[in-house]
């Protein structure tokens, strides 16, 4: 590709509204342009990368036995009513009506559509197992689109759906897709981790996320120092302490704390160790509980895991914190002074709190706390659950090593849906005995456009993008110095360009009438792995200059050997 016949829309300055590195560099490298909030046009350079990611994903998913199809972006609303997800998805599901006032949605995912297709097309166990996938545009009406294509409203996604006669078959399909994901991300040259995850709005049982490790990642992932265990922060289990609860050494006393409305203020003003405090959080109770709200009690230095809390049968979904008015009406005190002692509402205690003794907690009176509180003496312990986020150094749930925390960007997710959708939509087949069996489903997604941004977050330097070779927009750049003034430079560049392209190598030939400094900066910004600089001075010595983008090195290579040198770099 010649730059004179290409849309090379690089920018010198970083746009003010670009927060993360990938967004900044995608704009500066001329990969994308914003059309509206969360909507982006992919320019030629960006599209080349996107297509490479797509093709790697397609090849590995094909190799796993899946079959490509293509489903509409517009879906009938009635399908979403069949599964009950029309309400669960909330405002992210964009709804509209056509000219006949028939309701439709823009596809955020395609479980309903694919299940409808399979129930009409597949009738016998002999047609199974079946795994269908597509690479298609999706739309989710994000409340706050940000970070460029990392969290856009419209995005490109590979979504696959497997159908099996039993759970054993589902496990095989799931494992095959897990392996396909690993092969795809390995080929892309990404540092990633598959982690245990919560199934969320998709539903089902077992699930794993695939995270590209990056400091800018929105998600925290926990992994063992001595095993393959890894989970996202929502799923990671906080193991129950093995030590028994110490015997009380203090009597419970009431302490005036008029200026301590937070744990931090309590610790600072009254000298109590934060590990000896508990905080009591109130959330809306489910319909099964004989109370409007329920208390969740965690240690003062820990954070509530909202997903774990929402998964408790006593807690309403979605999770909703009680407001100040509710607390004052039901308890008579504000949020900073609440605790379990004397509380006439149900409460659930975190595992770490269950082994505490002589701790401090709110007295359910404004401006007062109890110190020296002990379970079973001052208040009955009751139900104990895992309520908190894990922290660095916690024991690993696998029993090996401790947990480390790193930030990651979720680029893929695989689910064992079971019969959650197939039962709701009556998707079954006749088995070998002629009996109707509801199908076991799996679903699998890769955020193709998000992979592009994630790769940049992981691969960049002060000069621009440093692409893994497999997904770079071009493999080699040819930069001829003053070719419009030097005939031999032009001839050498044209000859080399013809040779490399004939070999199937993707080359960007910078034939612009630009200053060398501008050309070099653009090539580095775009992140092309290999650059060949052709100039009169080096040719006088019989050489071309070769630059390796990732190693940030350059060397003189004999003109006659340059093609073999490039071939060696690519092998």
UniProtKB/Swiss-Prot annotation:
Gene name?
A: proS
Question: Has UniProt tagged this entry with the keyword Protein biosynthesis?
Answer: yes
Q: What is this protein called?
A: Proline--tRNA ligase
Q: Domain of life of the organism in this record?
A: Bacteria
Give the UniProt subcellular location, in the record's own words: Cytoplasm
- Catalytic activity, as annotated: tRNA(Pro) + L-proline + ATP = L-prolyl-tRNA(Pro) + AMP + diphosphate
Q: Name one GO molecular function term.
A: aminoacyl-tRNA deacylase activity
Top EC class, one word: ligase
